[in-house]
Amino acid sequence: MRFLGISGGSAGGNTEQALLAALRAAQTAAKTPATISLVRLKELSIGSGALDGHLPLPVVGKSNSTGPVSDDRPFILDQIMEADAIILGAPCITRTIPWEVKCFQDSTLGPFQDVTMAQKLVDAGKGHLVDQRIFKPRVLALVTLGGAFTTEWAPFTLPLLHQVFFPLGTQIVDQMQVFGTGVPDSFLLNSEAMVRAEELGRNLAQQAQATTEGEATYVGPRGMCPICHLSMFNFVGRDAVECATCGAKGRMGVGDDGHVEFVTDSEGESFSVLRRSGLKKHLQDLEQGLQAEGASTKVLDIKNELLKLGQSWVVAPPSRGGR
């Protein structure tokens, strides 16, 4: 069993401490010998030119340390592909996640590692273009910590961490959010948070084992959305509501206990990006867009006009020869 911790925090900081506590508990709870690895996103080298998502195939041993800017994306992707269970942790910075996490997501994962797109390539007889490990079942746990003691200062951390791995079809089985960790080692002083991190690690190990015997299930705290178990929603019509985290569709209602609840059904749940059906719907939308007619001469003329304006107005930074 291979466990991977991915930290978006500082070396030895509160986020890393929480990940290590969870990983240690996972190692102890694992029914088979466990291999533990920890990657610090702040230590990865990802050049600005890497945002096109191009990675050599297969990725094993393909990290480029000799180019103008070292590219560690193949290294981290190989770690992910080998993992059976992953814990992704990040601190809360200005109510959201650090830029290193988003850069890692956009340059390494996203549509470039989409399990639905990969399956389409295989079905089209182009399996040689796909790293077959992408189809491996994996479980994921999420951890976020912030300095504030109140929820309004950390609304986007867990919802955004949910976006990192869903293209891979990785199943989230637990998640935790810790408040009041704004100074070094404050996580270690929070005995309740330590106990919760260890519980999360054990849950991850148990559900990773479940993938070998059947299907893993979510065992973390329950939220209003039955899919992602968070409680952030978009009101997209007079009555229509969408889960802002995963995209499940439904409406708001009042339960028998008098509390507001999110009401959905199997059709509404099928739009969730955490469901394979949601990924397929998105792929169909993209394919429909690709079938649009080519640009007209008028559109091309406007495009060229705007490009010329951009060339005359852009201000280059010193690193690109600017003053």
UniProtKB/Swiss-Prot annotation:
<dbReference type="InterPro" id="IPR029039">
    <property type="entry name" value="Flavoprotein-like_sf"/>
</dbReference>
<keyword id="KW-0520">NAD</keyword>
<protein>
    <recommendedName>
        <fullName>Flavone synthase cfoJ</fullName>
        <ecNumber>1.14.-.-</ecNumber>
    </recommendedName>
</protein>
<dbReference type="GO" id="GO:0016491">
    <property type="term" value="F:oxidoreductase activity"/>
</dbReference>
<keyword id="KW-0560">Oxidoreductase</keyword>
<keyword id="KW-0284">Flavonoid biosynthesis</keyword>
<dbReference type="GO" id="GO:0009813">
    <property type="term" value="P:flavonoid biosynthetic process"/>
</dbReference>
<keyword id="KW-0288">FMN</keyword>
<comment type="function">
    <text>FMN-dependent oxidoreductase; part of the gene cluster that mediates the biosynthesis of chlorflavonin, a fungal flavonoid with acetolactate synthase inhibitory activity. Within the pathway, cfoJ acts as a flavone synthase (FNS) and catalyzes the formation of a double bond between C2 and C3, converting the flavanone into a flavone. The pathway begins with the PKS-NRPS hybrid synthetase cfoA that uses benzoic acid or p-hydroxybenzoic acid as a starter unit with four rounds of chain elongation using malonyl-CoA to form the chalcone skeleton.</text>
</comment>
<dbReference type="InterPro" id="IPR005025">
    <property type="entry name" value="FMN_Rdtase-like_dom"/>
</dbReference>
<comment type="pathway">
    <text>Secondary metabolite biosynthesis; flavonoid biosynthesis.</text>
</comment>
<dbReference type="Pfam" id="PF03358">
    <property type="entry name" value="FMN_red"/>
</dbReference>
<keyword id="KW-0285">Flavoprotein</keyword>
